[in-house]
Amino acid sequence: IAILMHAPAYNYRTDELNDYARKILRRTKGYKVDFITGHRHLNSTADIAPEIIEHSVAQVGGNLWFAPMCPDGTPHSVLTIEERNGEWSWRYRLLGESAEKQIMIVEDSADEVVIRIVGWDKKWSVEWAENGKDMGAMERTDMVDPDYRYYVENEANYNDSVMGHLRRKLISFPHYYRLKRTTENSEITITATDRFGRKYTIKSEKR
C-alpha cells in the first residue's frame, strides 16, 4: 500500500511514529506500506519497521523557493519510484541530469575529499580507491551542507524574516562521507552502492 500525505509519518527528533501514522498502520496491519510524505523540505528514507518505509521527499524548488537547494543540500530533483511485480525501487533524479548522478563532491582539497549522496539512506555503502589502490570504506560524517551554508552566508539577500528561516536550517545531516588522501593531489575514485545494489562512481582527478 502506498500512502501519500503532506505530514511526515515519522518524528525524526524523537525517533517515533507520529500518532496519526500509528492509526493508519493499525488499519493497514499485515500489508507492506510505503509512506510518501513532504513538509520537512528534506530528503530522507526511514525504515520504520520491517515492510514499513517512509520516503520524505525534498522540495523540488529548494528551501521554500528562497534557496536553490534544500538545507540538506538536495538540489532541484525529484524522487522516482519504479514498480515491478509488486516490488519497488527508487532513487532521486537531479533535474537535467542522468539518473546515474547520485554522488556530488562538495569539498576537494589536496589532502581531503568530502561527498554528498543525494538519495542516501542507512543501507548505502561507499568505498574509495587512491591511484587505483582499493582503500576500503569511506568515513560517514554528519555536517552542515557546504553548498547551503555558502548560499546563506554569501548569496542570499532577503528580508530579516526569510534570512532567519534560512539560517535556522543550518544544521547537520548524515549523508556525507569523507576521506584523507595518503598522497597529496592523488587520483581518487569513489564508488557508492545503494540498497538495490546499483553502483555509482565519481572521480577526483589529480591536480
Locate predicted features.
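Binuclear metal-dependent phosphoesterase catalytic core
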Residues: 52-131, 165-166, 172-205
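Flexible, glycine-rich phosphate/dinucleotide-binding loops
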Residues: 10, 63, 135
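His/acidic metal-ligating clusters that form di-metal
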Residues: 1-56, 77, 118
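Residue-level detector of flexible, active-site-proximal loop/helix-junction positions
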Residues: 42, 61, 142
